[in-house]
């Protein structure tokens, strides 16, 4: 299948005003939307047909041109182009702004890109943009320098004149005062009058002095400010700025608002700035260097791309197509509209008002205010609520801006691009279908008819049951009888996909061959329930139909349920008989020596079955039976004198003979009693030894026999079955005494409350265990509850203990254990107080489940995101590196046995180097597949450790290689090229996360049940590379430890071997120290009990150790919960966490200091530099949490659709990033085939052509149909039936015009 629409890169950049105008089909000038009388869009408004295209297909607005024949004509009356109405989904308009505005993403984002570029604090930038301060945009340094002496002289002259004027005015007042006083003296005035005259004169003089001094000060201020004025200075004092402009306006320019920013950007010299910053980075220290690094990133982004910084200030605003911001009429004649229309309307209104004010020549203050309002309107259109209070609609709801359309789960990325609705799908309740084969599902007839409708219609026409598609459609809609036969034929061998939400791993969607069933419920095979985590208490499932031949082939070959018997997480079987089937098979293989027919001899199996039917032989009675086709096994060796092909006389039960008949003919004889464990091993063994077809057939046999004998066994549960013969009171009495003694000691004050609690808990735990053991022993072997639990069919001993023995200790709402046990069992009944204590745990269990399910789902999402581009890209990267893995360890008797974790560490890998025996012989060559057989041989030969290939050491530049990944756990074969191993890893780690979380709930909150609280949060802490709480220190160097214990504190002192300064580690008093005083410790030793910080491990021991540490820690959590996950899945994620390097010194490479770069790019740049004899860069490994690593990916599409959408897009657009489209998400977003599986080029370039034979056999019997009756269709035929006539039978000889 070829893909012609392939393109290699997707670039994002800053749109300039020219770009916006070029995209636009016209300017939106009016804020109107539609005419409420005619319901037609207003001209030049937000829905204008002239700009955005016609609202009806092939019809202009005024109705002059209608029909497709006028295609492409532009109507001269209304100006609308005659075309399809769907162009209203992609035609944009624009608003021509009367004043420039800044793009809020670049000014208000964190960090402020505009602020970094112009070296302005965001606060200052805000002042300029929102008209609170002036910004100097240019200074004519030359002219100022030239005229400075003259200006200085002029200033001096002016100040002198002012001072002289002041002095002369004061002198005049003083002279007048003298005259007045002389006059008063002569008139013989009183002293009071003289004082009054003097005071008045003093006041006048003070006023003159104050006024003159203020003017002088202002002049001095203006002069000083002007003398030192430089570009980018801010002036918040309007009066001062105006005075300076009036006096020295010809030497500088300044302005407010986005205009000022725009002018600065137009004259900004990026080259010079970059040089200056690089110099600062080389010479600077601390804060200055850090800021310079951050600024250099922004400056460099514009230097290395075609982006112009002027794109951060807009002269025109794009108007998105009207179909993406629709307006719909509601029932009551009212209209519902998208919030964007309101936001656009505010922008247009303010813009038009500003234009009018400018035309009128309004005062500057009014114009500036309108410009500020326009800036705010555009801000809220782009990102409402980013600055100040958000614009709200009715009911104080913030309006959804363009940014909000992209963000979050309901945003464009996650809602529409990554999660689309699917055609050809249905949904219904599921019921069990025990009669189905493993690869089948039951599809309700009506649903199948709707799903396969087009296929059925085509086939009806092919078979001449209908003359054309229209009549075929009518037949289908009326459920004519022939339709069902055609449907039956069409669905043969056409697989359908079944999916159950939540789809936690890939087994949540599987393909089945549909079988038509009556009713309306889907029927599901019992063995696939565990893969889907489905039960039949009302669960629903969705059906999807693969349409193209390629899709059908993939569904059949890769997704068919009989091909998905193994779990991708650990390679263990997932389709294992459960519940009823286990009980049935367990009943079949039980041995009861004292039953009828024990010790009898039967020559053949048939004879034994006849005796069983006649009641002479019990199913479980041991007898000697002659078995045909016997295959000896370790447990049941061949009888003496027996040779292959003969009937073997075996001491067994009829049940076991019947059980062995279910297995493949050449399978060794099984003599064990069937339990959940033995059946699991059996299925694993079958999957390993036999082709999938045989395994699937055997599983179906086991299922059928299990249900049959389960019914036959008559296992039921009644309250009378809860009869355990043991003396509970006697056991409890002893422990009651112990508890009382502890309580008395506490009452006397001999022990503290903590000790009392822990001792009581200890006592009651022992009591509970003893009661449980006694109860278990007291249950009769054939007791149905005992059989259910011991066979693994349902329940566990913990539940039985609570029903028949003792409920035990429970936890309180805080999660602490209450030291008073619930002594009753459910069989005896709880007292009121006991019931009350028990409710806490049960409620907490339910609440926890809900919370943790959400957390676990979020963890899976982050894991998928970080690893989605890890795909097997090549067969072999050629590396010789690998990991050393322990495969054997001595047991208690000193014998060498396989290591308990060998299944999850060494199994399914590839050897990195030869394994040699003690005598030097090569036991296994490098490149060999490590399977169960090889591990067994190596352990037998005494090998304890092997070196295997690992994803962690893979050298593929993109993704990983098949050899380093090893076997695919789900198929048991080497991973294919194109396998999306990253996503499989994420699912394998995330899916049990949810299961663990959901398990708290079944135990009803019993204290001994391991709550996952250590589980999930610990996993998140590790994958997010967070520093744990109460972090345990590790030794940074090798040396000797001394413990210094003073009254106030405890310190560990480490004296390094190399004689350097000793290092002190303060520790808490209650901490458990893991090293002894005076002990010599190697580097990286953990000194105190607790959690180690992975970042410290990386710093001290390097990346390899950090990788191992993370893998081991994650595995510890899962193993403590009894969940098996293969190491390779964790390794895939950990590799992604350590992919990046921070550049410290850039050397002579094109890397920037402080830049986070991919390891492959770093190595390539250094190799190139060394090859040319230049200085290579130096860097340090960076451990990133999965969220941070996802956001740091090369793909901006993937990062934007993950989290922090606006921040990612802002940064990507500024850097003009190109998305290489290597991952899965980016390709889903742009609608290309994903580059995994058959979507890889090596497969898509393959062309598939059916052979002639295949074409002929497409439908086995073209006319294999009975004749159907259509009563009363054509009475003139003289009969009541009408037959479809094959086209070949028509006489084509005559001319139809005759």
Curated annotation (Swiss-Prot):
Keywords: DNA-directed RNA polymerase, Magnesium, Metal-binding, Nucleotidyltransferase, Transcription, Transferase, Zinc
The keyword Transcription is assigned to this record: yes
Residues that bind Mg(2+): 535, 537, 539
Entry note: cofactor: Binds 1 Mg(2+) ion per subunit.
Alphabetized PANTHER family for the sequence: DNA-DIRECTED RNA POLYMERASE (PTHR19376), DNA-DIRECTED RNA POLYMERASE SUBUNIT BETA (PTHR19376:SF54)
Quaternary structure and interacting proteins, as annotated: The RNAP catalytic core consists of 2 alpha, 1 beta, 1 beta' and 1 omega subunit. When a sigma factor is associated with the core the holoenzyme is formed, which can initiate transcription.
UniProt-recorded name of the protein: DNA-directed RNA polymerase subunit beta'
Species per Swiss-Prot/TrEMBL record: Micrococcus luteus (strain ATCC 4698 / DSM 20030 / JCM 1464 / CCM 169 / CCUG 5858 / IAM 1056 / NBRC 3333 / NCIMB 9278 / NCTC 2665 / VKM Ac-2230) (Micrococcus lysodeikticus)
Name of the gene: rpoC
